[in-house]
């Protein structure tokens, strides 16, 4: 400023400096420019809400709206008469559920089947973790992709087609029995499906075959997010591949595994019914009937929709309590809740 002080205006103009140049002039120039407005958080929130809205509507229609059907638990509901033509019986069906010795004995076996299937699933929940780690260690990318594809595809096969595969292989006239008979190893067909022995383990094996590859996808994504500098530092220190898996990969997958484990504990009564519905028969019905299938059989086969509704209510309430308990345990263990 002192160098230009007292200079003639034409000299300043020749030097490319306007007489009003300086901090004040610059601020005036900037003031005349267009300001960039910060993004509107309200507009962004509305956009995100519109994106989520269809899923909220679907959740409301298929998860919350059916709860209105719980009112049938207080009626002797007859589908042909409708709710208006059915007799109001109050808590009669609740009393039937807890007062009938036969009903309680049957329900006890159903709960034993349900809990056994769930605990077997929890006991084998680490298999997708180990499978993802081993799959990640395959160096040939074409072989890794082929294995991942072949193990993921069964997840997209319906349980009806899975049973068709099982029947064609393991029925009395299936491929396995035919081959063993032709080789002279057996004279009487072996019963793989028409038997009550090892039903829980058989259902577990089919469930693992169908869902192992799909369950490993989330862990493969978690492995891809691990900081590679950890592996590089360990290699510099002389760590082997097994040590990398044991001390880096496996511990880094544990937070994901714990969350999924807590959710599986909360859903311990939700086994689904499709698998058990297609595999059930007169020989294995006692040990294959889980709670979801039992509710279906009571309502549709036994023609007692009101009692089936009572069972569904108990299941929903217990599942909600288990979810809240699992969330509290997760919050205490991890410092943050899962819901």
Region roles according to the model:
Residues 1-51, 139-144, 327-339:
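Transmembrane alpha-helical segments of polytopic membrane transport and secretion proteins
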Residues 44-339:
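A structural signal for multi-pass alpha-helical bundles of membrane permease subunits
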């Amino acid at each position: 400023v002192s160098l230009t002080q007292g200079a003639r205006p034409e000299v300043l103009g020749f030097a490319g400096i306007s007489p009003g140049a300086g901090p004040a002039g610059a601020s005036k120039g900037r003031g005349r420019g267009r300001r960039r407005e910060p993004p509107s958080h309200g507009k962004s929130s509305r956009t995100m809400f519109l994106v989520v809205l269809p899923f909220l509507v679907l959740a409301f229609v298929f998860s919350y709206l059916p709860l209105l059907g719980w009112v049938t638990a207080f009626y002797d509901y007859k589908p042909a008469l409708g709710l208006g033509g059915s007799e109001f019986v109050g808590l009669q069906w609740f009393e039937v559920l807890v007062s009938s010795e036969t009903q309680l004995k049957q329900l006890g076996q159903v709960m034993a089947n349900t809990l056994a299937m769930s605990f077997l699933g929890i006991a084998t929940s680490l298999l997708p973790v180990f499978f993802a780690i081993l799959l990640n260690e395959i160096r040939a990318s074409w072989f890794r992709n082929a294995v991942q594809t072949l193990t993921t595809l069964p997840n997209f096969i319906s349980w009806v087609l899975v049973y068709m595969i099982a029947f064609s292989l393991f029925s009395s006239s299936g491929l396995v029995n035919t081959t063993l008979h032709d080789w002279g190893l057996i004279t009487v067909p072996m019963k793989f499906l028409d038997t009550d022995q090892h039903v829980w383990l058989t259902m577990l094996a089919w469930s693992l075959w169908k869902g192992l590859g799909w369950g490993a996808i989330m862990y493969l994504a978690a492995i891809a997010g691990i900081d590679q500098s950890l592996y590089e530092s360990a290699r510099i220190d002389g760590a082997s591949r097994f040590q990398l898996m044991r001390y880096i990969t496996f511990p880094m997958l544990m937070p994901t595994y714990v969350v999924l484990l807590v959710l599986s504990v909360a859903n311990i009564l939700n086994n689904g019914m499709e698998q058990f519905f297609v595999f059930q028969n007169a020989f294995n019905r006692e040990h294959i009937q889980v709670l979801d299938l039992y509710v279906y059989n009571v309502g549709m086969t036994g023609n007692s929709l009101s009692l089936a509704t009572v069972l569904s209510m108990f299941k929903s309430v217990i599942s909600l309590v288990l979810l809240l308990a699992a969330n509290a345990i997760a919050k205490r263990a991890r410092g943050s809740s899962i819901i």
